[in-house]
Amino acid sequence: MSDTSFVRTEMLAPRPAPVSQVGAIKWMRENLFSGPLNTALTVFGLLATVWLVQAAAPWLLHGVWNANSLTECRAIIAERWGPEATGACWAVIRVRWNQFLFGFYPVDQYWRLFVTFAGLFLALAPVLFDALPRKLIWGTLLYPLAAFWLLWGGPIWGPVSVLAGFAILGLLFTALAPKLGVPVSAGIGLVVAALFWLYAAAPIEAALQSALPLALPEVDSDQFGGFLLALVIGVTAIVVSLPLGILLALGRQSDMLIVKSLSVGIIEFVRGVPLITLLFTASLLLQYFLPPGTNFDLILRVVILVTLFAAAYIAEVIRGGLAALPRGQYEAADALGLDYWQAQRLIIMPQALKISIPGIVSSFIGLFKDTTLVAFVGLFDPLKGISNVVRSDMAWKGTYWEPYIFVALIFFLFNFSMSRYSMYLERKLKRDHR
């Protein structure tokens, strides 16, 4: 055995990594061709994609945007691409876009819709992005009343009286909560606010309207339709169902028998009944239980029951988040001397909501898509109601895929945005160190 050692005095130039171990080729080997089954599925998927593109591409590329009827669309396609060619008649979207978006809302009042939608984004901004000043939350709280007045019109003093009732509720709750506790003070505030709305609001509204008449032209609910209707129902149900679902989830875990029984009953009943049944109840049966002569708006009835339906599912999602928390979190709250509501607000519920983000957003996406079911109770949703109205016009009779594709793209835009925001929120709130 030799004692002579060898020491290299110069560095070798680094060699590039094998082509099969880096870049796109490596990714394809690991994800698309990692085995016989994956290879077969990849080849089948490629063949199906090629067939679909070959079938759909001519129809999409031959589409016509400038026409006044389906007959004119077909004539233009035949002139450009031959008598046997087919193509999409996108002109129906160009001509009827306002009905798909706004239903039968008066055209001269579209400015109210634009102001409402711009206000919606401004109201959601401080809720979705905590970098903004917290004082902007006051604008978020005032937005629902302003949006109601802008959309439906009428005297401004109606929303003002509703705001006054909530102000009374908030003042009483703030004053009584330290002495009587959260449940009792909230109950007293609700009773006083309800008495104000029942007996004092109407005379005050009439007096203010006679002294200072401020009103917008009224718009009936049967003129709502399209994505305006979907957003009114969907956004309202999403915003209200989350706090209501939190209360139902906490009620289901309560030690008080009445509260727990009511919460379990509401959750199980609503989850066990199809949404379409609740919509028919809102449309037909609910009117029989109201006093004679009561005019309870159909959209409001639908919003209430859709909100209850969503809240029941949100409650179960949040209950799963609560169950995932270790017992030590509750013990830590007790060790700090926090009462029940302080513990829920500061320690328990923030962690449960963070765990439940994927399930909550999935419920919201499903809820927004389910707004199309209101077509079965006579409302003009964008998918079925407005599409049928457009096709009932002889100029566009025969169009089929174009309205559905347009509506699907807009639904995808909203739902994809919600999905991406939930992923952003999960990354932002991630606190583990894996």
Swiss-Prot record:
Keywords for the protein's UniProt record, in alphabetical order: Amino-acid transport, Cell inner membrane, Cell membrane, Membrane, Transmembrane, Transmembrane helix, Transport
Cellular localization per UniProt: Cell inner membrane
Predominant place of localization: membrane
Protein's GO biological process: amino acid transport
Pfam families linked to this entry: BPD_transp_1
Keyword Transmembrane helix listed: yes
Signal sequence region: none
GO molecular function: transmembrane transporter activity
Annotated Gene Ontology cellular component terms: ATP-binding cassette (ABC) transporter complex
Ranges for domain ABC transmembrane type-1: 227-422
Domain of life: Bacteria
SUBUNIT field: BztB and BztC form a heterodimer which can form a membrane complex with a homodimer of BztD.
Known function: Part of a binding-protein-dependent transport system for glutamate, glutamine, aspartate and asparagine. Probably responsible for the translocation of the substrate across the membrane.
PANTHER family: INNER MEMBRANE AMINO-ACID ABC TRANSPORTER PERMEASE PROTEIN YHDY (PTHR30614:SF41), MEMBRANE COMPONENT OF AMINO ACID ABC TRANSPORTER (PTHR30614)
Family: Belongs to the binding-protein-dependent transport system permease family. HisMQ subfamily.
Name of the featured protein: Glutamate/glutamine/aspartate/asparagine transport system permease protein BztC
